[in-house]
A protein has these predicted regions:
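Structural preference for solvent-exposed beta-strand-turn elements
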Residues: 1-207
Length: 207
């Protein structure tokens, strides 16, 4: 079924029960109140198979912690195709912490959270930001996610939702070397005041 068209129809339907019926393999009818829609689907055989991600060796992460890491780093990902490795977010998994890093070569965002009793296999994963954005939006903060890795895929699931994504291949650049080690220049600022000032200045700032 065309996903975009189905989403648009569902968004406009009234808060009433929806009856869904299928005739053949490629025709679906949706009925809600006095509204009736007929959709022409695609052959089932053309739908891609799910990646071979087995959750036997999975680990668990609180969705709220994952959302915090994503929202503080994914915005810095590069959108240029010349360096595809920077089009992903680096997710570092360690025994006692997990960290996400993103950079476009001009700016860098990094956030780290402590982890107690982690069962995640230590390693580095490079995840597409679009997949992380879907995870951030689909899973409530209070849920605990089950995560597993396949050959080149990553799977996230809760009792009712599953998300799979292909990982970005290749070694991530050594971002640590661009972060000053002995930097005595820093400042403390009120977050609300700084955010307000930046919003005012961005009105006249050029791209």
């Amino acid at each position: 079924i065309p996903a975009k068209k189905l989403s648009e129809i569902a968004r406009e339907l009234p808060p009433s029960p929806v009856k869904i019926s299928a005739s053949g393999e490629q025709r679906v009818t949706l009925e809600c109140g006095r509204s009736k829609f007929k959709l022409l689907g695609l052959p089932r055989d053309e739908f891609p198979t799910f990646p071979s991600v087995r959750f036997n060796d999975s680990w668990r992460v609180k969705s709220g912690e994952l959302q915090k890491l994503i929202s503080h780093t994914a915005f810095a990902v590069s959108t240029e195709e010349s360096r595809p490795i920077l089009n992903g977010v680096l997710w570092e998994l360690r025994d006692d912490r997990m960290r996400m890093v993103a950079t476009n070569g001009h700016r860098l965002a990094k956030m780290e959270l402590p982890v107690e009793g982690s069962t995640a296999p230590p390693g580095d994963l490079i995840v597409p930001p679009k997949a992380l954005d879907q995870i951030r939006r689909l899973f409530p903060a209070e849920e605990e996610l089950e995560i597993a890795r396949g050959d080149n895929h990553l799977g996230f699931r809760s009792p009712f939702t599953s998300v799979f994504t292909r990982l970005v291949e290749g070694p991530y650049p050594n971002y640590e070397q661009v972060i000053p080690k002995d930097n005595d220049r820093y400042c403390l600022a009120d977050k609300a005041a700084l955010t307000s000032a930046l919003k005012r200045m961005s009105v006249i700032a050029s791209d």
